[in-house]
Amino acid sequence: MGFYAPAQIVRDARDHGVNVLHPDVNYIGWDCDLEPQSNGELALRLGLRQIKGLRQQDAMLIEQNRKSGYSHPRELISRAGVQLSTLELLARGDAFQSMELSRRQAFWTVRGIANSTFDSLTEKDSGLPLFSNNKESYSNKTSHSEPKVSLPIASIGEEVIDDYNTLKLSLKSHPLALLREDLSGSSYKAISILENLADGSPVLLAGLVLVRQRPST
């Protein structure tokens, strides 16, 4: 919408009662779309276009080959034909939530796929007949080869930073919400209380610069 950044539009929509959902490989394609909810209302699902660096062509392949859904990130390679680099972008964008994978779990899983691919290529190049009579597909082979690990849970601050780095917005929290308690004890004021202050009262405001207007006015 021209001058307005996606973060501003999403924030305004949520302030007006619109349920906004995260981009997910099992629910959306390139563009944002309305998604029916169990309560009969419509939610706004953000499109994969919101993920920094993701190509429209890859988003279209993911949507076209989704069918009944993806159950594991590797299926986006075997069915949609996307590259490992695309899986990494999707993992960083936290787009595997429908698979019950957090951002860290998804990235760990994708790196496991990358390592399995490298090992397979190395074995083939060595001339060993390891796969010559093996009827198992690559996807079946790797489905049981990933180690089970317990990854540390990211803090809400880390999640918000990662969201802004990949999506340029966050549905989990607002950066200033994490600082509000520290700021409230100083001269910084919330916009919601400005109308109650006496005329001429000195105040400090804290906020995010989403768009730099050029030339400035």
Feature annotation, model-predicted:
Residues 1-217:
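Noncatalytic, beta-rich nucleic-acid-contacting surfaces in large DNA/RNA-processing enzymes
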